[in-house]
Curated annotation (Swiss-Prot):
GO molecular function, one term: rRNA binding
Presence of keyword Ribonucleoprotein: yes
A Gene Ontology cellular-component term: ribonucleoprotein complex
An individual GO BP term: translation
NCBIfam families reported in the protein's UniProt record: L21 (TIGR00061)
InterPro entries xrefs: bL21-like (IPR028909), bL21-like_sf (IPR036164), Ribosomal_bL21 (IPR001787)
General function of this protein: This protein binds to 23S rRNA in the presence of protein L20.
Protein name (Swiss-Prot/TrEMBL): Large ribosomal subunit protein bL21
Gene source species: Fervidobacterium nodosum (strain ATCC 35602 / DSM 5306 / Rt17-B1)
Family, per entry: Belongs to the bacterial ribosomal protein bL21 family.
Keywords for this protein: Ribonucleoprotein, Ribosomal protein, RNA-binding, rRNA-binding
Assembly behavior: Part of the 50S ribosomal subunit. Contacts protein L20.
Signal peptide: none
Length: 106
């Protein structure tokens, strides 16, 4: 069974036991339970597909926050020709890792 869930403006495919790397979720600590309720699609083990318009109200996905961490550094550069000017900046995006515990259809 798998589901497609929306979180942080993006859609992710999740299965029970998998780790989900999503945008940083403020207000939750490591070890807290999280309920993802914006479920777009669910495919059950017997092949049945449930599609929401836009979301499924009878499906909830629960998980546990594993960690808050930062991604690899991305370098952004600017070069102005004939002036000898160069600028390089770095950015590391925060993300939250969630372990999916259960996909429940009510």
């Amino acid at each position: 069974m798998y589901a497609i869930v929306e979180n942080g403006g993006k859609q992710y495919k999740v299965e029970v036991g998998h780790l989900l790397h999503t945008e940083k979720m403020n207000g939750v600590a490591q070890g807290d339970k999280v309920v993802l309720d914006k479920v777009v699609l669910v495919k059950t083990d017997d092949g049945k597909v449930l599609v929401g318009k836009p979301y499924l109200t009878n499906v909830t996905i629960t998980g546990i926050v594993v960690e808050h961490a930062r991604a690899r550094k991305i370098l952004v550069g600017q070069f102005i020709p004939r002036k000898g000017h160069k600028t390089i900046k770095g950015h590391r995006q925060w993300y939250t890792t969630i372990k999916i515990e259960n996909i429940e259809i009510k």
